[in-house]
Amino acid sequence: MAYATILMIFSVVALMSGERAHAAVDCSSLILNMADCLSFVTSGSTVVKPEGTCCSGLKTVVRTGPECLCEAFKNSGSLGLTLDLSKAASLPSVCKVAAPPSARCGLSVSGDPPATAPGLSPTAGAGAPALSSGANAATPVSSPRSSDASLLSVSFAFVIFMALISSFY
């Protein structure tokens, strides 16, 4: 049951990343190759090495559409999924996959948030809004919202995906 939940969350992330990725690569299906990586990169996970087909899935994503990897990491917070950025950044070296800089998403293995990826901070929840430096610390700055059309297409894809998953149970 827990595996099905993790797979569902990862699939929704993949569907959302497909909305924003280049049209030449189908990120939604490509990221599903990395479903076994989620147990390793989820914040608070005690898994010490990637499981199952994680590394072969990572290799497929890096070879086919490395930008999809970054999109999945960036969109994970919108689903309430918090990632351990140190583990996420270490995936290529742990899996012995040569990843181009675009597949590293600006993440550093030390866990320090890079200047190029402010939405991926290990100190705040991945979905937490950023705080303005001049504002009261209790007042969050509104994040830009996606258009209603994009939200509708993700919702429709989610309904289709859930129907598919429920047919197996």
Swiss-Prot record:
Covalent lipid adducts (GPI-anchor amidated serine), residues: 146
Q: Which residues form a coiled coil?
A: none
Q: Where is the signal peptide?
A: 1-23
Q: Which domain of life is it from?
A: Eukaryota
Under Pfam families, the record lists:
LTP_2
Q: Which SUPFAM superfamilies match?
A: Bifunctional inhibitor/lipid-transfer protein/seed storage 2S albumin
User: Which tissues and organs express this gene's product?
Assistant: Expressed in a vascular-specific manner, mainly in roots, and, to a lower extent, in hypocotyls, seedlings stems and flowers.
Q: Which GO terms describe its cellular component?
A: extracellular region; plasma membrane; side of membrane
* Keyword rRNA processing belongs to the record: no
Removed propeptide positions: 147-169
MF-aspect GO terms: lipid binding
Question: What InterPro entries does this protein's entry cite?
Answer: Bifun_inhib/LTP/seed_sf, Bifunc_inhib/LTP/seed_store, LTSS, Plant_nsLTP
Among the GO biological process terms of this entry, one is: xylem development
- Name the residues that span the membrane: none
Identify the keywords attached in UniProt to this record, alphabetized. Cell membrane, Disulfide bond, Glycoprotein, GPI-anchor, Lipoprotein, Membrane, Secreted, Signal
Q: What is this protein called?
A: Non-specific lipid transfer protein GPI-anchored 11
Q: Which organism is it from?
A: Arabidopsis thaliana
> What phylogenetic lineage does the species belong to?
Eukaryota, Viridiplantae, Streptophyta, Embryophyta, Tracheophyta
